[in-house]
């Protein structure tokens, strides 16, 4: 009985050491390492698809309803449970879950776009990236789409969270190209 107990303890110790000695410093199986993400035309196409997937989530639900509530397009009724009351009154804070979700998801989208734009900028720096002229032109189109997506996200955030423009209190832009 004592020998069986010792054998069990030794076997359990060996098994534990065997399991914990595995190499766990690996990238997740469903992710591409950052340095390998944008090195082929396929990588750019997949990143572009990731940017476009943003539109699925950011063009429906609370994202569409919030500005309508802020613009008084919807008015509260007796049984609306004050779900968007803070937005309706323009008294919302960053702790409001709707505001936090909209803010964080748009900035996550901007982060994806910035990663893509940075990757396009590094094409010429990386001698391992070999692209045909047609592929370079296609990536330039994708880059333009990325800039549009970033502008869309900033526009939406400004529409929801910025004050109205007031000429009287606006800063004077000196040496501005756009007059």
Give the location of each predicted region:
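Sec-dependent bacterial lipoprotein signal peptides
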Residues: 1-20
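A general secondary-structure boundary signal
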Residues: 10, 20-21, 80-84, 114
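Membrane-proximal, proline-rich intrinsically disordered regions
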Residues: 22-71
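Generic structural "secondary-structure junction" signal
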Residues: 26-29, 34, 40, 89-94, ...
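Secretory-pathway/luminal and periplasmic proteins that interact with or process carbohydrate-rich
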Residues: 56-62, 76, 153-164
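Primarily recognizes Gram-negative and organellar outer-membrane beta-barrels
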Residues: 71-73, 133
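Conserved, well-structured interaction surfaces
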Residues: 82-161
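Short, flexible helix-coil linker/hinge segments at the edges of structured domains or between repeats
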Residues: 167-179
